[in-house]
Amino acid sequence: MAGNAVAANKVDLGNGWYRCSLSVNANVSKVHFRPAFNTSTSKTTGSLLYQSAQLESGLVATDYLDSTSVTGKAGVLVDLPRINYDANGQNGSLLLEPSRANLLPYSEYFETSEWTTPNVVFETNKATSPDGGFNATKFRANSANSTHWASTGVTLTSGQDYTFKLYVKAAEYNWVQISLFGTGWVGSTKKINFNASTGEFGTTDTGITFDSNPMGNGWHEVFVTNEAASTTATIRVYPLKSDDVTSYQGDGSSGIYIYGAQLESGSYVSSYIPTMGTSETRAADSCSV
């Protein structure tokens, strides 16, 4: 891989067929594929069999969509009814939500300039995420004896409530701290600490609302709400060894898994809206009988 490549993968489908995929962080205007003599030299003669080309937004290849003469579509932004179930996977009900926008341009890809990363490292595609793809990120501390965190700046409307959420899963570390950081938020810095192994909160500040939902396979949806005090603010996330201890000796490999960062205007959390380079808006749901 080179340039803006994020990940490459191949799956053996049997009978000599392979499904090959390449993920890039770039504006794509053309896709080229050609026979090759080796890893660096293309051939001018010879042939290969190709089938079922697909270009999509995302960090991993998803199930093939037959597009014929129109674009194939799937996923949470498609105009299809959504059923919400209880924690036991029972008692389904139609999910109807107002229009919401995820204000973060990259909800699943964290290795961008949107995030400042002193003493931490993001590693893309290191675990299976809540959506079933191998597209969760390892969020680990480096080997420094220091504070380990990542932050992103956001543009807000002063006086409005905003809700930030992140999907987290324990790895070598169990704890994560989410901090609505600085004077851009009412009450200045407000933080929550969450144990992704037990599903319980540790040290938390007052003056904010927060909660979590189990997502299965060790994943938890963790969210926190506060009012904006300014038009700009900061969100910080810390991988932690223990509750509320942000400065420690890292080992360069240990951390937690994260997925699906979302910031939305509103006093409560809504369902996940994936973004791949720009803010995305989910239209309001409606139902008539």
What are these regions (language model features)?
Residues 1-289:
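Glycine- and acidic residue-enriched flexible segments with recurrent GG/GxG motifs
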